[in-house]
Amino acid sequence: MLKVSARHAPVLRLPRRFYAQKTRVVIGPRLKNLDEIKEYLGKPTWSVEKYLQSSSNGETQPPSRETVEKLLKLSGLPNENVEMFQATLGKQLAFINKVQSLPVDESLDPSHARIIDRNSEALDYESLSCSVEQQETEKDSKMGEVGGSWDGTGLAAISENGFYVLREGLLKNRK
């Protein structure tokens, strides 16, 4: 059924099964009890400190002074403490090189690496308008929401059909 309202554009009302999507986020295998959770959290995989310590051994050279000065200029920072920035950037680059050289376990499912669904569909106007209409009709009484109870133009000096009326020009002595 097509409903035409003075406030909104025409909206096609469809049963929920036509536009509702069920999304479920799967991060990894489900842990069934407290012992499995403790076992999972008790297994250390790797330590950042281990790679930071090994990266400070001088395996990679820090960036040159000219490079650091150029980066400081691009970022708008003063050219003070260039040596400190040079050492810090050297440690960070060594750490990144270590992380990139780590062996990757190919048996792991790469879809578990993200929380957000990688295969999400584009949102179109119809599904957006239907979900807005659904939210308007399904107010939460626990939260004190009452459908149609708020009048956004109720305090306006001049309104017509639920819209504000704006006048152009100087508003001296006008009502």
From Swiss-Prot:
Keyword vocabulary terms for this entry: ATP-binding, Ligase, Membrane, Mitochondrion, Mitochondrion inner membrane, Nucleotide-binding, Protein biosynthesis, Transit peptide
The UniProt record lists the keyword Translocase: no
GO terms for biological process, alphabetical: glutaminyl-tRNAGln biosynthesis via transamidation; mitochondrial translation
Keyword Cytoplasm included in the entry's annotation: no
This enzyme's EC code(s): 6.3.5.-
One family name in Pfam for this protein: GatF
Annotated membrane topology: Peripheral membrane protein
Function: Allows the formation of correctly charged Gln-tRNA(Gln) through the transamidation of misacylated Glu-tRNA(Gln) in the mitochondria. The reaction takes place in the presence of glutamine and ATP through an activated gamma-phospho-Glu-tRNA(Gln). Required for proper protein synthesis within the mitochondrion.
Protein name: Glutamyl-tRNA(Gln) amidotransferase subunit F, mitochondrial
Biological source species: Lachancea thermotolerans (strain ATCC 56472 / CBS 6340 / NRRL Y-8284) (Yeast)
Lineage, uppermost ranks: Eukaryota, Fungi, Dikarya, Ascomycota, Saccharomycotina
Gene name in the database record: GTF1
